[in-house]
Amino acid sequence: MRRDLRGRKVRTIAVFATVGALLLAGCSGDDGDKADPTTTSTTVGSSTPPTTGSSAEKLHILVSNDDGYAADGIDALVQGLGDLDNVDVVVVAPRDQQSGQGGRTTLGPLAVTDVTTKSGYPAKAVAGFPADSVRVALDELKVEADVVITGINAGQNLGPILDVSGTVGAARAAVARGIPALAVSQGSGAPEYQYEVAVPAVLDWVRDHREQLLDGTLDPVVTNLNVPSCAKGQMRGLAEVPTDPDGDATASIGSQDCASTVAFSPEMGEVEAFVNGYATINEVPAEPKTPADVYPAGGATTSTSAG
């Protein structure tokens, strides 16, 4: 069965062997550059679902994000997932940049457009919030999914900012429908977002949980993975730590010191571990603390991530 991270300070620290080499590579491209749609917009009701595999052994992965279908992070994720054996990857993501939207959803029909990611992978672009994209994919397009992976987000999502994250909000929309989800974010603060460092961590997680995902024994929870971007040094390891909703808000959005000499300890919180160069992984609540925490004045069209 799955490892229960709730209520635990630390379960393990594991260093990815490939990180050193990967840090030598850089990411290129601007998330603001949109790929050209290949067809005109349609409404949800008339969209054709993306083709999914039929093999019982094939793992079906739905990918979404909050930075939009043309972002570098989602493209790096999709390319990385292609290295896995016997998987079917479907991309349904927001048409536009939707960071900081939490679990907001839209009432009524939404336009869905056939597009491609930056590298040319087929995708569906939804004219709505991140949680809308997952809702549309699962409820309207009837995409088959054993797991939903959201990201790779441009910027960490941890500590007190967790509940405003569209990356987490989209993952919560999957969990509300009984599907396990992995929310993945790459830290900010280095000259470039090092998405290539997060990809191996995602692939390791999928490989570790593949059989449980296929046989339906992995609990439908949101697993939140944050990977540092290192201006100097290398990612120092992977820390399984509880969420830290009362952590330092300023530090939670700051840079990461991968050259830090601060030793890891079981007393470290999520934010402290991350800013000292550790990737962090934990389970987050399926719902935000209160709607007001996610939807400040001005509000959302709905009050939960379920849609």
Give each language-model segment a name.
Residues 2-14:
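Bacterial N-terminal signal peptides that target proteins for export
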Residues 23-26:
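C-terminal motif of bacterial Sec signal peptides marking the signal peptidase cleavage site
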Residues 28-52:
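Short, low-complexity, disordered segments immediately C-terminal to signal peptides
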Residues 43-62, 302-303, 307:
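N-terminal low-complexity, Pro/Thr/Ser-rich intrinsically disordered segments
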Residues 57, 79-133, 144:
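A cross-family phosphate/adenosyl-ligand binding-site feature
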Residues 64-67, 92-97, 127-129, 151-154, ...:
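Active-site-proximal beta-strand/loop segments in catalytic clefts of secreted hydrolases
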Residues 163-169:
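Charged helix-capping and loop-helix junction motifs
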Residues 196-307:
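Electrostatically charged, flexible surface regions
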